Amino acid sequence: DADVLVLNKVQVNEHTIGTARNLKLVCVTATGTNNLDKDYLDRRNIAWRNVAGYSTESVAQHTFAMLFYLLEKLRYYDDYVKEERYVGDTIFTHFAERFCQIHGKTWGIIGLGNIGRRVADIAKAFGANVIYYSTSGSNTQDGYTRTDFDTLLATSDIISVHAPLTPNTEHLIDAKALSKMKPSAIFLNLGRGPIVVEEDLADALESGQIAAAGLDVLCTEPM
């Protein structure tokens, strides 16, 4: 009998709402809308709305939290101190695991929407050279260099995904794409899980094809 549905992380399609004959509006309490069968909603003249921009600052912050963890080898150095290996060292500077700074690195952003733009601004403040690839092919942003997909993969030291899940982005990061990245590349996915072929990413990490990866999203959650 509902006229309006308010939900998140629930599939909305003919199977789930086929008997909801009074439904006029579906409200998603998130930014992503890949859980909606929009063609079916259009056929039934059911409107939908999302909350664009609600998580921009949080996701941008989490992007850098993951990057710092990987870039500065924080797990290794945290364990090194907690296991009391530092107190027994003969030198005060221990650099068994090398790390580097963001300044001067090329940061490639896949999907320069609200979140991608915020990440770009912060990366620029750290001194990174920011480039981006438009997954829709229509997004042009002042202040940053737009490039093609292959160039972004080949030249970026850090690659972060902030794109929605669409037919253009599903399985975008596969074995072929990963093979074009630098061996030193750090890859971050903060878009949607199915943008990445997880088996291909695992292979790339295990073989040393890329240096590291941070995943905020997975194909199946919880994994």
Summary of predicted features, one role per range:
Residues L23, H103-T106, A175, S184:
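Phosphate-coordination loops involved in phosphoryl transfer and adenosine-cofactor binding
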Residues L112-G113:
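Glycine-rich Rossmann-fold phosphate-binding loop(s) that bind the pyrophosphate
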Residues D1-R49, A154, D174:
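An N-terminal-biased, well-structured beta-alpha scaffold segment characteristic
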Residues T29-A30, N45-E57, S134, G191:
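Short beta->alpha connector loops at strand-helix junctions that form conserved
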Residues T106, A120, A128-N129:
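Residues at the starts of beta-strands that form the adenosine-phosphate
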Residues G116-R117:
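N-terminal Rossmann-fold NAD(P) dinucleotide-binding loop
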Residues I46, A52-T106:
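Phosphate-binding beta-alpha-beta segment of Rossmann-like dinucleotide-binding domains, i.e.
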Residues N13-T16, S136-M223:
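Rossmann-like adenosine-cofactor binding region
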